[in-house]
Amino acid sequence: IVMPNLVPPVTTIAAAEAYRARILAARPPELAGPPSHSQGFTPLMTCYLTDDARADEIERGFKSGVFTAVKLYPAHATTNSASGVTDLGKCRAVLAAMERLRMPLLIHGEVTDAAVDVFDRERVFIERHLTKLVRDFPGLKIVLEHVTTKDAVDFVRAAGLTIGATITAHHLIINRNAIFACGLRPHMCCLPIAKRESHRRALRAAATSGDAKFFLGTASAPHPIHD
């Protein structure tokens, strides 16, 4: 799955096709075989959801095989998310079309309200937005990306079969203590930020449970090589 948070973001079929071509051109020789080859590499492109996203463009992209999913970034929640969604109410036509098409919505599940503690942003997103989204669009396929809390694990487990979640390797390895061990360690900071040990244990239990609702998400945002 290729994330669409470039600058400018991947919001059209043409932009996704151009980005896919760039990715394929950068493949090392050992990954240059056709998709059917055992070592082949097939980038699955996604569309960046915005307040003014067009349902017809997303439907054409999905039906043509260009878009595999749509990615929801709350505006200013993470890397290159300035163009993200400010109000899910503005996206209802797109979400209804996706529900009809059985097209997955991939969600960075954090609120950006400055009044919410950074360690609570995932939990509050679930309470304020995800619960309502699932209620309003019960057939919508949703993946809650890079979950970091027991709250998210419990929500996904309790939800229907259309709801899943990814878990990153680093959120299985570190808790929030790692950020402050012997001073501030900025290379341990990521978004969503690591949480307390009880949450890490819940993630590990989910990742090793055999429950197909939970699967790997490497969560590497697009950055220039020099960064």
Feature-to-residue mapping (PLM):
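Metal-cofactor-binding active-site regions of metalloenzymes
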Residues: 1-82
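Conserved active-site loop/cleft motifs that coordinate metal ions or position small ligands
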Residues: 1-2, 215-217
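Histidine/acidic residue-rich metal-binding segments in metalloenzymes
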Residues: 53-72, 78-216
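Short, intrinsically disordered, charge-balanced linker/junction segments flanking boundaries
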Residues: 225-227
